[in-house]
UniProtKB/Swiss-Prot annotation:
Taxonomic source organism: Polaromonas naphthalenivorans (strain CJ2)
Name of the protein this chain belongs to: Holliday junction branch migration complex subunit RuvB
Cellular component annotations (GO), alphabetically ordered: cytoplasm; Holliday junction resolvase complex
Residues annotated as binding ATP: 36-37, 78, 81-83, 144-146, 187, 197, 234
InterPro entries: AAA+_ATPase (IPR003593), AAA_lid_4 (IPR041445), DNA_helicase_Holl-junc_RuvB (IPR004605), P-loop_NTPase (IPR027417), RuvB-like_N (IPR008824), RuvB_C (IPR008823), WH-like_DNA-bd_sf (IPR036388), WH_DNA-bd_sf (IPR036390)
Catalytic activity: ATP + H2O = ADP + phosphate + H(+)
Gene: ruvB
Region (Large ATPase domain (RuvB-L)) location: 13-197
Subunit structure: Homohexamer. Forms an RuvA(8)-RuvB(12)-Holliday junction (HJ) complex. HJ DNA is sandwiched between 2 RuvA tetramers; dsDNA enters through RuvA and exits via RuvB. An RuvB hexamer assembles on each DNA strand where it exits the tetramer. Each RuvB hexamer is contacted by two RuvA subunits (via domain III) on 2 adjacent RuvB subunits; this complex drives branch migration. In the full resolvosome a probable DNA-RuvA(4)-RuvB(12)-RuvC(2) complex forms which resolves the HJ.
EC number: 3.6.4.-
Residues involved in Mg(2+) binding: 82
GO biological process: DNA recombination; DNA repair
Subcellular location: Cytoplasm
Amino acid sequence: MTIQTDDFDMSDLPPARRMLSAAPASPKEEAIERALRPKLFDDYVGQTKAREQLEIFIGAANKRQEALDHVLLFGPPGLGKTTLSHIIAHELGVNMRSTSGPVLEKPKDLAALLTNLEKNDVLFIDEIHRLSPVVEEILYPALEDYQIDIMIGEGPAARSIKLDLQPFTLVGATTRAGMLTNPLRDRFGIVARLEFYTPEELARIVKRSAGLLNAPMDAEGGFEIARRSRGTPRIANRLLRRVRDYADVKGNGTITLDIANRALAMLDVDPQGFDLMDRKFLEAVILRFDGGPVGLDNIAASIGEESGTIEDVIEPYLIQQGFLQRTPRGRIATLAAYRHLGVAPPRGNAENLFEE
């Protein structure tokens, strides 16, 4: 199958605020990203440990013809939690209903979803850590006993009735597993942490996506896109589409190493995979706060970004690459960060720079 972006109306897309953000795109960009998602484990790349476990658990559930145990997927944004949930439903041969924690404001919102599930269906709740306490309370008996208690009527005439549900599988996704309440976390029988992808894994993803987009690309060009994608498939696919645009206008349509380098330089994505926001973050820590330790709120105010975005989107990759440390006293830039910006570490302080 070849995906043509002409199939999607892109005329009123809002401008991207940050190319390397792994946050979900606009609905129309999301439509293209959905078309690039693998549908089966056979097409799925990376997350070897989580994939192997899920394949075994799904195979066992299919063999016994019962609902898969509830699944919690957690990790930084853009690593494929939603994609995995679709694959789980597809491999189980059942339907999937999708929602998110903030959308489920009242118990009746969740009850409407649960009562419409068919036997062994999958219910996917993104940002499950943002469920309200009152909705979460309704979810507990549904997860354990496939039953919910709902109130009928109001005032003195109100009464509670118990409804039986079809067996189902809840797949919860979160970037902040630590914010889940213990009672909710304990009700997941399968917990999988998604890790950043290697450049080699991302190169395979980029190659597959280029084929679906009918975008000619050599191996070197694909690998250059992959290694600058912050270990994140969503970013890799987003960069691929922008590099393809550059190749069509400034080249002969083929994504080569030279085309990839020039396109990514135009997008301000450096060889380390950092963009302007990453460099702005490191510059704030090093130049404004003497390398740290500095609190998150101070950094957020300094660079004009929300604390939650910094924690979820910017910091994980910087920490994973060894450019930043989180300590009890605050954030500290590492020697690698100083070298990357071409700034000399404070004289006489290099040895103590990274003490916690």
